[in-house]
């Protein structure tokens, strides 16, 4: 080896000298006078990170809480999940049980009675019963309801009837026992009747002679008062009359506007009437008696309940021994033979009756015409009085049915 080569070897770094010759693949060094290219630092390759699992998809029911939800110190914020867990056991209220009406012939023991209560206050002694054939007799109703207790009144109308007991227990028992029973091949509906509608009435004194109910209505109209009834006692004229109004407010106004005013040369006075006389109606039916039927018929009715479906008591129902006779041909004139007496003419139409009310059972469900029942058309008409269609059931008369010769009941005076 020459000296030049040895000198060059000595100038190399030790790492190069010690390395094997076959592993040295370096380029020969450049001349010192040649400019060296600047070395650009190589960028380090990015390190591959471990793959991250994607976030679990949220359930459809999970709704993210609002960003402005309040967070209190020392307490955790309530999330939507907490709210759902707190209300997951919330259940709607259970519906009330429904009791269907029993089939014909089945008793209702163990069930609440089917009152089918309608809006408004109901009587606890007066019952509404339907359906009945148009030719149903009062004696048949007495046989049905007589065993449950003394009755005050049985009133038969077209296709339905009202039965009033003296005691509430008797009425409740009648509903339980009779409701759903078959009569004339139809199940009966027995429910409580509505209470009489309240009446707003005033009595008038010192009316001029010749005054009629139309004159009183005109007087009220001139004073901007709405009326539902007007009446003047013209049979035995004593200068008294009455007006009825649809509300308490109008009644109060009438007391202020009509008291001590001059009317056809007379100064009239008016007073509130808190106990008005009952409204009489001409209809079928007419039994009244506080004692009810007692003692029983000897022979009973032919075949019991001939209509079928309802087995009456063995002993029938109480009453006079002679039984009932038939209806007289002239309408309601009492019973002709062996029964209750009565004048041939029947009812004497009061002088302050209905003008043209809408009566009868028309709308409504169980027991339930809206107005309970109204007077039949033409039953209360007449030339000396007029109702403008009052609404509501006014209940039973206070006294027994009057004959034509009986004195007329006058409006109470104070």
Curated annotation (Swiss-Prot):
Which GO cellular component does the record give, naming just one?
A: nucleus
Quaternary structure, per UniProt, is:
Interacts with RRP6.
Annotated protein name in UniProt: Serine/arginine (SR)-type shuttling mRNA binding protein NPL3
Identify the domain of life: Eukaryota
Where is the organism placed in the taxonomic lineage, from the top?
A: Eukaryota, Fungi, Dikarya, Ascomycota, Saccharomycotina
Q: Which gene encodes it?
A: NPL3
**Primary subcellular site in the record, as a coarse category:** cytoplasm
Outcome following mutation: residue 411 to A: Shifts localization of the protein to the cytoplasm at steady state
Alphabetically sorted, this entry's keywords are:
Cytoplasm, Methylation, mRNA processing, Nucleus, Phosphoprotein, Repeat, Ribonucleoprotein, Ribosome biogenesis, RNA-binding
Domain RRM: residue ranges: 125-195, 200-275
């Amino acid at each position: 080896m020459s000296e030049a080569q040895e000198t060059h070897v000595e100038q190399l770094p030790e790492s190069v000298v010690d390395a094997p010759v076959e592993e040295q693949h370096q380029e020969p060094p450049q001349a010192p006078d040649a400019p060296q290219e600047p070395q650009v630092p190589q960028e380090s390759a990015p390190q591959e990170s471990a793959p991250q699992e994607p976030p679990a998809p949220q359930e459809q029911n999970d709704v993210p809480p609002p960003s402005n939800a309040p967070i209190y110190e020392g307490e955790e914020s309530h999330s939507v999940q907490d709210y759902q867990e707190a209300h997951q056991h919330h259940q709607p209220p259970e519906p009330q049980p429904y009791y269907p009406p029993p089939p014909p012939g089945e008793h209702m023991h163990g069930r609440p009675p089917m009152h089918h209560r309608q809006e408004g206050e109901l009587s606890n002694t007066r019952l509404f019963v339907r359906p009945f054939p148009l030719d149903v007799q009062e004696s048949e109703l007495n046989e049905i309801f007589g065993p449950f207790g003394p009755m005050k009144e049985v009133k038969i109308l077209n296709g339905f009837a009202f039965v009033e007991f003296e005691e509430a227990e008797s009425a409740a028992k009648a509903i339980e026992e009779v409701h759903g029973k078959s009569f004339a091949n139809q199940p009966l509906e027995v429910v409580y009747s509505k209470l009489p509608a309240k009446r707003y009435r005033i009595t008038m004194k010192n009316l001029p002679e010749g005054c009629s109910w139309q004159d009183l209505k005109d007087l009220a109209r001139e004073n901007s008062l709405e009326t539902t009834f007007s009446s003047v006692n013209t049979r035995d004229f004593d200068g008294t009359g009455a007006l009825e109004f649809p509300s308490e407010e109008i009644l109060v106004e009438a007391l202020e506007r009509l008291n001590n005013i001059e009317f056809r040369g007379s100064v009239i006075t008016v007073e509130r009437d808190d106990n008005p006389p009952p409204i009489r109606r001409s209809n079928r039916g007419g039994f009244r008696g506080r004692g009810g039927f007692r003692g029983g018929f000897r022979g009973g009715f032919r075949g019991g309940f001939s209509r079928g479906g309802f087995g009456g008591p063995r002993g029938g129902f109480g009453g006079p021994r002679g039984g009932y006779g038939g209806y007289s041909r002239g309408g309601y004139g009492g019973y002709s033979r062996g029964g209750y007496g009565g004048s041939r003419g029947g009812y004497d139409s009061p002088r302050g009756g209905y003008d043209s009310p809408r009566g009868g059972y028309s709308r409504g469900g169980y027991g339930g015409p809206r107005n309970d029942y109204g007077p039949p058309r033409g039953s209360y008409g007449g030339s000396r009085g007029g109702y403008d269609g009052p609404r509501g059931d006014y209940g039973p008369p206070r006294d027994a049915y009057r004959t034509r010769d009986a004195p007329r009941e006058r409006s109470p005076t104070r």
